[in-house]
């Protein structure tokens, strides 16, 4: 699943390519991609004629701020969640359709934003002007603070973790604890901070939480600089792979030597997800 760095990479690409471009129409090939409460017709009618002012990211959600009608001061929104395998690709309209194409958004000059999604879990929303974004895209209301927010302090993270009697890796995947963090970067941050993934939150010391907060920010920044991670489906808006996988410390490296101590990287199942770590470097 695309995590914060992959979604941020897509956001930056969209801001480079789609701003101030007029949406001329669209085509929804898989109707369930358009999330309730609005219909496919509402979605297409709502976005057609709009221009994109800017793209925002909240956790793993992408939010396009659309141009408002002259008669109102409130703005409509276009929301996207890539889920497991979603891709947003900026293409010429005459490009052959990929078999997993779900939604096409047409722009002037024969360009389009194409939503491709093999597993079909991805979703798109239209939020009319005058309606709170969180009332339509309800998952936004449950998100924790962003790791790049000033609110993501040591005290904040300690308060989120200390009363949870579950492995710290499992807690870090909870979007109400840290928004945008997923399996890849939780493993990487735990390695950088020297904490084993199965350590209970109640057993993590404050000095470890300080290291963990710093590590989370560092690994996310490093991955964004590398354009994210591609192990299976992720592509940026130009169809290019991310490169963080080549510099990963532990993720997807089971059986290989640790880059720090040379011990073998191990993998276990924790909460139904694979966790990668080094027994020598993490305690």
From Swiss-Prot:
Cofactor(s) in the UniProt record = Zn(2+)
Catalytic machinery residues: 2-3, 60, 273
GO molecular-function term, one example from the UniProt record:
zinc ion binding
Q: What are the protein's UniProt keywords?
A: DNA damage, DNA repair, DNA-binding, Glycosidase, Hydrolase, Lyase, Metal-binding, Multifunctional enzyme, Zinc, Zinc-finger
Q: Which reaction does it catalyse?
A: Hydrolysis of DNA containing ring-opened 7-methylguanine residues, releasing 2,6-diamino-4-hydroxy-5-(N-methyl)formamidopyrimidine; 2'-deoxyribonucleotide-(2'-deoxyribose 5'-phosphate)-2'-deoxyribonucleotide-DNA = a 3'-end 2'-deoxyribonucleotide-(2,3-dehydro-2,3-deoxyribose 5'-phosphate)-DNA + a 5'-end 5'-phospho-2'-deoxyribonucleoside-DNA + H(+)
Source organism, top-level taxon:
Bacteria
Question: Does the keyword Lyase feature in the UniProt annotation?
Answer: yes
ZnF (FPG-type) ranges: 249-283
What InterPro entries does the annotation carry?
DNA_glyclase/AP_lyase_DNA-bd, DNA_glyclase_Znf_dom_DNA_BS, Formamido-pyr_DNA_Glyclase, FPG_cat, MutM-like_N-ter, Ribosomal_uS13-like_H2TH, Znf_DNA_glyclase/AP_lyase, Znf_FPG/IleRS
Q: Does the keyword Lyase apply?
A: yes
Catalytic activity, EC: 3.2.2.23, 4.2.99.18
Cofactor binding mode and count: Binds 1 zinc ion per subunit.
Q: Which GO terms describe its biological process?
A: base-excision repair
- Listed binding positions for DNA are 100, 119, 164
Under the heading CDD domains, the entry gives: EcFpg-like_N
Q: Which Pfam families match?
A: Fapy_DNA_glyco, H2TH, zf-FPG_IleRS
Instruction: Spell out the subunit comment.
Output: Monomer.
- Read off the PANTHER family from this record: FORMAMIDOPYRIMIDINE-DNA GLYCOSYLASE (PTHR22993:SF9)
The record's NCBIfam families line, in alphabetical order, gives:
fpg (TIGR00577), PRK01103.1 (NF002211), PRK13945.1 (NF010551)
**To which protein family does this belong?**
Belongs to the FPG family.
State its role. Answer: Involved in base excision repair of DNA damaged by oxidation or by mutagenic agents. Acts as a DNA glycosylase that recognizes and removes damaged bases. Has a preference for oxidized purines, such as 7,8-dihydro-8-oxoguanine (8-oxoG). Has AP (apurinic/apyrimidinic) lyase activity and introduces nicks in the DNA strand. Cleaves the DNA backbone by beta-delta elimination to generate a single-strand break at the site of the removed base with both 3'- and 5'-phosphates.
Q: What is this protein called?
A: Formamidopyrimidine-DNA glycosylase
Q: Which organism is it from?
A: Nostoc sp. (strain PCC 7120 / SAG 25.82 / UTEX 2576)
Q: What is the lineage of its organism?
A: Bacteria, Bacillati, Cyanobacteriota, Cyanophyceae, Nostocales
Q: Which gene encodes it?
A: mutM
């Amino acid at each position: 699943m695309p995590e914060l760095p992959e979604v941020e990479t897509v956001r930056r690409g969209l801001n480079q390519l789609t701003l101030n471009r007029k949406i001329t129409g669209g085509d929804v090939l898989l109707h369930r991609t358009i999330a309730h409460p609005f219909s496919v017709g509402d979605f297409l009618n709502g976005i057609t004629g709009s221009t994109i002012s800017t793209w925002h990211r909240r956790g793993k959600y992408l939010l396009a701020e659309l141009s408002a009608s002259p008669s109102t001061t409130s703005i409509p929104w276009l929301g996207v969640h890539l889920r497991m395998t979603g891709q947003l690709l900026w293409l010429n309209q005459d490009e052959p359709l990929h078999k997993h194409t779900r939604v096409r958004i047409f722009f002037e000059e024969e360009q389009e934003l194409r939503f491709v999604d093999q597993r079909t879990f991805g979703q798109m929303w239209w939020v009319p002007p005058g309606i709170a974004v969180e009332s339509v895209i309800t998952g936004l209301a449950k998100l924790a603070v962003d790791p790049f927010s000033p609110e993501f302090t040591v005290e904040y993270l300690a308060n989120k973790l200390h009363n949870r009697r579950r492995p710290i890796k499992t807690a870090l995947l909870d979007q109400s604890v840290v928004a945008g963090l997923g399996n890849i970067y939780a493993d990487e941050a735990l390695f950088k901070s020297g904490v084993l993934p199965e350590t209970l939150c109640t057993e993590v010391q404050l000095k470890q939480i300080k290291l963990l907060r710093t590590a989370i920010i560092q690994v996310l920044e490093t991955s964004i600089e590398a354009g994210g991670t591609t192990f299976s489906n992720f592509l940026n808006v130009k169809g290019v792979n991310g490169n963080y996988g080549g510099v990963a410390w532990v993720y997807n490296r089971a059986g290989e030597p640790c880059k720090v101590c040379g011990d073998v990287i191990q993998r276990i199942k924790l909460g139904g997800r694979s966790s990668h770590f080094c027994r020598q470097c993490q305690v």
